[in-house]
Swiss-Prot record:
Belongs to the ATPase alpha/beta chains family. GO terms for cellular component: plasma membrane; proton-transporting two-sector ATPase complex, catalytic domain. It is a peripheral membrane protein. Disulfide bonds: none annotated. The keyword Transport applies. Keywords: ATP synthesis, Cell membrane, Hydrogen ion transport, Ion transport, Membrane, Transport. Gene3D superfamilies: 3.40.50.12240. It is found in: Cell membrane. Has multiple subunits with at least A(3), B(3), C, D, E, F, H, I and proteolipid K(x). It comes from Methanoregula boonei (strain DSM 21154 / JCM 14090 / 6A8). GO terms for biological process: proton motive force-driven plasma membrane ATP synthesis. InterPro entries: ATP-synt_VA_C (IPR055190), ATPase_a/bsu_AS (IPR020003), ATPase_A1-cplx_bsu (IPR005724), ATPase_F1/V1/A1_a/bsu_N (IPR004100), ATPase_F1/V1/A1_a/bsu_nucl-bd (IPR000194), P-loop_NTPase (IPR027417), V-ATPase_su_B/beta (IPR022879). This is A-type ATP synthase subunit B. PROSITE patterns: ATPASE_ALPHA_BETA.
Length: 462
């Protein structure tokens, strides 16, 4: 262990130390104060004669005469089966009043990118119990599908509902949820803990909570701790793991804060130029590995500043991930929960996990027809505001009514309502039955005869 007393500068969470020997990147550091207190940090940058250390807590009490000890080790996450059912801080320490976790292994939190050749193509449907996701923007095991939200919208409720209800229908394989919250208030943290305990979802979950008043540096390691835990459960214990990360905007703000303290040249809107690479290091840790039983599926959640989908955070996230679920303020104002707008939403891997052998043979066609009907009906609302409803044709009035029914019956559902994929598709058929059969141009005739409620009822009478 190397020790120096050569602190030259302290800026925010960063401590600058002169050194004479080589120091490794991301090496753990112990800073000993004059009263014997030890503060922990990590090497953020190293050059020929200077090391930048980021402190995992406040820099209060650190002086030029404080001892700086370089341990020669990187951050490792203690992992084990005992983690299931536990609530941990953003730094990986138990905060639920339970005993310390006895680790089976200690793993480097940086992880490693999955070799593209070793990746298996995602193909298994994950049922979230939310119709707007399962029916029209299906989540597939091994996918990374973000939720784009805005300040004040109920994305945390959606996250908790997914964490509680997510499952692979008909599968007997072990399923777990790793939930990591970053930059949340104490009120939100209490709400998360109470909801997990009330619903019993905590039994198969590991929860990490980083509070808003915790150091920004801790916010940087929280998602990495969560993903290291998920990779252990998936690839060493053979479990299928869903990782929910909220709120990635707070994570990116922490990146910007640390970048400013390091006096880096800023990129777009003040965010570091390497933010794309940094986010990719997190998102790309999802997937399925050939020959391995487990999988890691990711749902990162972020709030778009000013509801701007072109902001660097959602913009870069969209480049890396495989689609997006968009939470809409207008639907929220109408009192609709979950306020998910299916029109700008997209799941790029949806077609790999639906259809015969996965969900149901009519899934793709029903989804396409509902999307087309809702899109046209939604466009007609703008026309009605100009010319009035009476000026519409009978066909247009039917589509306008379909758009209202779609929001009220399909999009709207209860916080504790867990719909099966059969419930979702049957509900879709009920809505489509309000339109004339000849307008269902995106559905094959044999599927209409088999699933259309009115035609099914007629066939039974005969």
């Amino acid at each position: 262990m190397k020790e120096y007393r050569t602190i030259t500068k302290i800026a925010g969470p960063l401590v600058f130390v002169e050194k004479t020997e080589p120091i490794g990147y991301q090496e753990l550091v112990n800073i000993v104060l004059s009263d014997g207190t030890i503060k922990r940090g990590q090497v953020l940058d190293t050059s020929d004669d200077l090391v930048v250390v980021q402190i995992f807590e406040t820099t209060t009490g650190i002086g030029r005469d404080s001892g700086v000890r370089f341990t020669g080790e990187t951050i490792k996450m203690p992992v084990g089966r005992e983690m299931l059912g536990r609530i941990l801080s953003g730094g990986g320490k138990p905060i639920d009043g339970g005993p310390e976790i006895v680790p089976e292994k200690r793993l480097d939190i940086t992880g490693a990118a999955i070799n593209p050749w070793a990746r298996n193509s995602p193909s298994d449907f994950i049922q979230t119990g939310i119709s707007t996701i399962d029916g029209t923007n299906t989540l597939v095991r091994g996918q990374k599908l973000p939720i784009f939200s805005g300040a004040g919208l109920p994305h945390n409720n959606v996250a908790l509902q997914i964490a509680r209800q997510a499952k692979v229908p008909g599968s007997t394989e072990s399923f777990a949820v790793v939930f990591a919250a970053m930059g949340i208030t104490k009120e939100e943290a209490n709400y998360f803990m109470q909801d997990f305990e009330r619903t019993g979802a905590l039994e198969h979950a590991v929860v990490f909570l980083n509070l808003a008043d915790d150091p920004a540096v801790e916010r940087i390691i929280t998602p990495r701790l969560a993903l290291t835990t998920a990779e252990y459960l998936a690839f060493e214990l053979g479990m299928h793991v869903l990782v929910i990360l909220t709120d990635m905007t707070n994570y990116c703000e922490a990146l910007r804060q640390i970048g400013a303290a390091r006096e880096e040249v800023p990129g777009r809107r003040g965010y570091p130029g390497y933010m794309y690479t940094d986010l990719a290091c997190i998102y790309e840790r999802a997937g399925i590995i050939k020959g391995q039983k487990g999988s890691v599926t990711q749902i990162p959640i972020l709030t778009m500043p000013g509801d701007d989908i072109t902001h660097p955070i959602p913009d870069l996230t969209g480049y890396i991930t495989e689609g997006q679920i968009v939470v809409n303020r207008e639907l929220h104002r109408k009192g609709i929960y979950p306020p998910i707008n299916v029109l700008p939403s997209l799941s790029r891997l949806m077609n790999l996990g639906i259809g015969k052998g996965h969900t149901r043979e009519d899934h793709k066609k029903v989804s396409d027809q509902m999307y087309a009907g809702y899109a046209e009906g939604n466009d007609l609302r703008g026309l009605v505001a100009i010319v009035g409803k009476d000026a519409l044709s009978e066909r247009d009035r039917g589509l306008l009514e379909f758009a209202d029914l779609f929001e009220d019956k399909f999009v709207r559902q209860g916080y504790d309502e867990d719909r099966t994929i059969e419930d979702t598709l049957d509900l879709g058929w009920d809505l489509l039955s309000t339109l004339p059969v000849e307008q269902l141009t995106r559905i094959d005739r044999d599927l209409i005869n088999k699933y259309h409620p009115k035609l099914k009822a007629g066939a039974k009478k005969e």
